Amino acid sequence: MLTINASPNAPAANSQLMGGFWSGVSQLSTGKKRGAIGQAQMQLVQQLLAAELNASAFGSIPATGSFAAWESAFCGTNANAVKNAQQQAASFNSQGDNSTFTPGTSADSKFARFIANLLFWDKYTN
């Protein structure tokens, strides 16, 4: 389970969830380069987090793949499995691109970046 505290007075770097979205794919927060599998894992985690949120918000389920399979690929070291999971999650996330839904509030990218815990995702370095 990932942490998120998005209250208006939330402390900096408290949100592991936002850290997943804002962490660099090719580099760690320290500037060190991620390896090929680490980069693929970070591409997957951004799609996977979005997919989990989309499923929760809209009640949708993937047509191909599954959250369990994508999470398993993320935790593994098979680059092809990670890339396949990323493609499936990205496809799932784009299924509703042409749908109409009631908009919520505007996003606040500055605050989202402020609360993002980037260090949490530095462990994916391979």
Language model region names:
Residues 1-126:
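Soluble extracellular-acting proteins and domains
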